[in-house]
């Protein structure tokens, strides 16, 4: 009996160390950033079982077998659709401004199409204005409405949007609604899904959270896009979820959420439509390619239009493109670079690009919320402040609520707006979308919004920052070490 017990004990110990060695080897063999690999190894060596379970659950990008197969299967038809779109040569920009040209060329090479011109674009900063405009557009819709959001929170004006969407479905408009399972948990627990389906709306719960499948797909891989397309001609995107800020997270202690949305008319809606169709097929297996490009591209006035490129990220889309786009934008800056984000946990490369821009004389400003709804990200963000301040970067802490806007402005001409936070999840994990806009007029509008944010912010004093308590420095470094995992 003692011999059997001893043998079992040795086998258990051997299996334990083989498991640790196997996971270690797997981490080392994966092509990943060194800080991320080191952070995972530290967790596994300090808390082996917890670390191994955590790594297998969220350490690698698992879309899931079924979704991965759909992603592979959809590309032949998607590629053909993109080739057909290229035949509509009159919608594509042939040249760009000097500051935007490198970024637009990068996107064209990696995504297969150039930026589209002739779009009308309106910047919107008030949630009431966004929802009222959206309700009007829904009421005037004639063919189809496609919507995807990370969060849909019932209450306030969000319910009015839901009512207008159901009314559209009842009068024969084809309506599709895709919402992230984790972000929209309150919606899926409410009566709204059943009401919408009964009205004729196709409602899809994207990336369902299922603990039974935690090792088959990453549970923290989320559908983070916010997009609305109407009749393949009107489109919305930006940082705003389908929530009424007056009712959303009022007990979080961070104030009202501050967002930015763009409303567009023109061929950009078709370019966004193909992104939506890919997401829909990955999630449902159903192919819903937009109408042939030569049918739905409307006449436009080229001289008064904006040139826009859509940048999509996530499994099945060009890897690392949004990260490359941000690096390209930072290195293209010659006069000034302004960035706004609620969550700032940049990669080493992006941090270096931002600091280098400041060190070569570019006026660099970063606007962050003073209070954050994520304690982990809030502390991790602070760990980068010393290096940024030393390089000459101006850090503004917004005091008018939770600044949720994600925007970048380069030299007043190249603008990036969308759903992408400057953190690891947005850069390498989630389904995201960013618009790259090459236009001085839009740049002036975005600059005015950013100036308003700055007027409601406090400039971080480098001298006072260096005098902060020791315990804060220790906490910052602790969270900094785990920043590659956030």
From Swiss-Prot:
Record: active site: 224, 226, 231, 404, 406, 411
EC number from the UniProt entry: 2.7.8.-
Transmembrane segments: 3-23, 38-58
Catalysis: reaction(s): 2 a 1,2-diacyl-sn-glycero-3-phospho-(1'-sn-glycerol) = a cardiolipin + glycerol
Top-level taxon: Bacteria
Gene3D superfamilies, sorted: Endonuclease Chain A
Claim: Cell cycle is one of the keywords in the record: no
InterPro entries in alphabetical order: Cardiolipin_synthase, CL_synthase_A, CLS_N, PLD-like_dom, PLipase_D/transphosphatidylase
Listed Pfam families: PLDc_2 (PF13091), PLDc_N (PF13396)
Membrane protein topology class: Multi-pass membrane protein
Biological-process GO terms, alphabetical: cardiolipin biosynthetic process
Localization: Cell inner membrane
Entry keyword Signal: no
Domain PLD phosphodiesterase residue range list: 219-246, 399-426
Keywords: Cell inner membrane, Cell membrane, Lipid biosynthesis, Lipid metabolism, Membrane, Phospholipid biosynthesis, Phospholipid metabolism, Repeat, Transferase, Transmembrane, Transmembrane helix
MF term (GO), any: cardiolipin synthase activity
Any single Gene Ontology cellular-component annotation: plasma membrane
Family that this chain belongs to: Belongs to the phospholipase D family. Cardiolipin synthase subfamily. ClsA sub-subfamily.
Function of the molecule: Catalyzes the reversible phosphatidyl group transfer from one phosphatidylglycerol molecule to another to form cardiolipin (CL) (diphosphatidylglycerol) and glycerol.
Protein name in the entry: Cardiolipin synthase A
Organism: Shigella boydii serotype 4 (strain Sb227)
């Amino acid at each position: 009996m003692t011999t059997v017990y001893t043998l079992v004990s040795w086998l258990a110990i051997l299996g334990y160390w083989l498991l640790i060695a196997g996971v270690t080897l797997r981490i080392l063999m994966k092509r990943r950033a060194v800080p991320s690999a080191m952070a995972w190894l530290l967790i596994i060596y300090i808390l082996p079982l917890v670390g191994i379970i955590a790594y297998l659950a969220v350490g690698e990008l698992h879309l899931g077998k079924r979704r991965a197969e759909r992603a592979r299967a959809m590309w032949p038809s998607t590629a053909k659709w993109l080739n057909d779109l290229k035949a509509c040569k009159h919608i594509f920009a042939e040249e760009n401004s000097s500051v935007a040209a490198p970024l637009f060329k990068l996107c064209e090479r990696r995504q297969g199409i150039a930026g589209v011109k002739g779009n009308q674009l309106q910047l919107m900063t008030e949630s009431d204005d966004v929802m009222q405009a959206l309700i009007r557009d829904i009421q005037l819709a004639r063919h189809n409405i496609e919507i995807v959001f990370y969060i849909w929170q019932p209450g306030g004006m969000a319910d009015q949007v839901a009512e207008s969407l159901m009314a559209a479905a009842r009068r024969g408009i084809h309506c599709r609604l895709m919402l992230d399972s984790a972000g929209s948990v309150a919606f899926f627990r409410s009566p709204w899904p059943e009401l919408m389906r009964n009205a004729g709306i196709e409602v899809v719960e994207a990336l369902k959270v299922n603990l039974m499948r935690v090792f088959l797909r990453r549970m923290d891989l989320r559908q983070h896009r916010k997009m609305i397309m109407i009749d393949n001609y009107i489109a919305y995107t930006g940082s705003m979820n389908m929530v009424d800020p007056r009712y959303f997270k009022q007990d979080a202690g961070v104030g009202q959420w501050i967002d930015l949305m763009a409303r567009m008319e023109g061929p950009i809606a078709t370019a966004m439509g193909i992104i939506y169709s890919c997401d829909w097929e990955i999630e449902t297996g159903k192919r819903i390619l937009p109408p042939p490009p030569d049918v739905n591209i409307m006449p436009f006035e080229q001289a008064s239009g904006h040139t826009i490129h859509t940048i999509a990220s996530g499994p099945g889309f060009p890897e690392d493109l949004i990260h490359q786009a941000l690096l390209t934008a930072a290195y293209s800056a010659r006069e000034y670079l302004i960035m706004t984000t609620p969550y700032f946990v940049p990669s080493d490369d992006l941090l270096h690009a931002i600091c280098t821009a400041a060190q070569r004389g570019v006026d660099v400003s970063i606007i962050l919320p003073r209070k954050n709804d994520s304690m982990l990200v809030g502390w991790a963000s602070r760990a980068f402040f010393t290096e940024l301040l030393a390089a000459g970067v101006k850090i503004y802490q917004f005091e008018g609520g939770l600044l949720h806007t994600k925007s970048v402005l380069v030299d007043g001409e190249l603008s990036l707006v969308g759903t992408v936070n400057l953190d690891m999840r947005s850069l390498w994990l989630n389904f995201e979308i960013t618009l790259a806009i090459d236009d001085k007029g839009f740049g002036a509008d975005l600059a005015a919004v950013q100036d308003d944010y700055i007027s409601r912010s406090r400039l971080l004093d480098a001298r006072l920052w260096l005098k902060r308590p020791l315990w804060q420095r220790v906490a910052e470094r602790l969270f900094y070490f785990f920043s590659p995992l956030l």
